[in-house]
Amino acid sequence: MRTIWFAALLAASLLALPAAARPLGKAEARALDRAIGAYLRAIETGDAQGVIAAMPPRVVSIFGAATGLEEKALRTMLVAQTDALMRTTTVRNLAADRSALDAGDETLADGTTVVWVIVPTVFVSEAGGKTARNEQPLLALREGKAWHFLRIDGRERREVAALAYPFLAGKTFPEARTTPLQ
């Protein structure tokens, strides 16, 4: 009886452990590098459509369910909101640290395999006459062959990410930092 109890406890504790982080494979790293480059260019050039296109479809579905909007209408609204924000904010010196990215591998309840990485980003923003240096973690997720990106720089954003990707619930992520500049 003790053996069965111990085996059950061991199995439960192993299931509770997060998947081991691993370095990205060469092909994965190249694909992620291209996707990050396209995403950063979209931000730098004020391409709201490109920014929204990079959002994970599962997150868009959650927003759609919460708002009652169909995906096309929701994406149109998100592009308009992002465009309005980008028109009042200048972003420069945008960079992502790709030097030491460790990936996690997870399988969702529907059988979808997801590779995820936290990408440190830094940029300078100017809005309303104020300039700030921003350091933000960016969640990169690969489902199938496509990489998608989601900011996770606050509790609400992390909660939305965990709704779409339950394996993220309870994970600790680097905090965003904003430093005013003169």
Summary of predicted features, one role per range:
Residues M1-I4:
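Positively charged n-region of N-terminal signal peptides that target proteins for export
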Residues A7-A16:
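Bacterial N-terminal signal peptides
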Residues A19-T45:
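Short, low-complexity N-terminal intrinsically disordered segments enriched in polar/charged residues
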Residues A21-K26, T76-A80, P174-Q182:
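Compositionally biased, proline/threonine/alanine/serine-rich low-complexity intrinsically disordered stretches
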Residues R22, A73-R133:
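Surface-exposed, charged secondary-structure patches
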Residues D47-I62:
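Short, well-ordered alpha-helical segments enriched in acidic and aromatic residues
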Residues V60-E71:
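A short gly/proline-enriched turn/hairpin at secondary-structure junctions
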Residues A127-P137, L141-Q182:
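Low-complexity, intrinsically disordered terminal/linker segments enriched in charged
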